[in-house]
Amino acid sequence: MIGITPKGKQEEVMALPAKGHIVVLGTAGSGKTTIALLRAHHLANIPNGGRVLLVTFNGALVKYMRGISDSNSYKLVVENYHKFARGYLNCRGKMPRWNGILSPDEKTYYVGQALEAIKAQHPTESTFRRSKEFFVDEITFIQRFGFAGFGEYYEAERIGRAAANIKRENRKWIYAVYEKYNELREAAGRKYDWDDLAFYVFNELQDDDTDRLYTHIIVDEGQDFSPMMIRSLVDAVAEGGSFTFFGDVAQQIYGGRLSWRDSGIKADRIWRFNVNYRNPATITAFAKDITESDYWEQDSDMIEATTQIAEGPKPILVKFSNKKC
């Protein structure tokens, strides 16, 4: 196993009980990925304990985690979310053998077809003057938050969607395009796209009364996950098991500020890693100035590094005369 000894709050998180929900928020470079991997090994080595899933969003991080781990235990599985999702739906007989998931380009095509179909029915509606890309983005927003119907979408706060200003009374037109998109997709024999896969996993888990495969699930880089991804993983944990969320919510990813509070996680407290072992103080101070600017959406969950271990030169700012340089 990697030769790193947890320190301070890291050590406290390692010692937490193997049950319930745990949330760990930290700055970049505070050791979240390392502790996620160490905790996964710890849980996998509990005598007579269950299986452990360490899940992240991208394949590159999966390869990195496997590369620095020397564990061959069948009890520890490291994979990205979409592999978990496809595997689960497949074992439930809900994943087509070929071409079951639309590619991003195919999704854009079917959204465009849906837009034209609804627009033809309401040619004077100004909402349909927006671009096809706008509708793709808004439908993705609907999918990632897993709204159960139009009512939930109508009432939803525009988290991370300030740039896509939509009056509530006009949301019905977007939802009509969304429903038409689903209709066209299903008619073509394509049940899922990459953005609503988690929605179907969650719904399938609601109807699944068989024993859960994993006793413990650990999410690393949780800020990369949509709310529906998190909700599905929370529901995939066996009764009496644990769910651990490691996230850097100081990052703005997907245009949506993922809050663990909106994702089905029930934690009594938040553990915070605020010691930066990677970036020098000069870089951290520069990043802090950016987060305090008008260009950055403020968030109460953001963790500010209080200590920097590394030292280094000040960052160099380069200004160009135009965007083409």
PLM regions: where:
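Structural motif
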Residues: 125-135, 168-170, 188-193
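Conserved helicase motor core of SF1/SF2 NTP-dependent helicases
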Residues: 3-12, 22-100, 167-170, 176, ...
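Intrinsically disordered or highly flexible coil/loop and linker segments, enriched in small
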Residues: 120, 124, 145-149, 187-191, ...
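Short coil/turn segments at secondary-structure boundaries
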Residues: 27-28, 151-156, 190-199
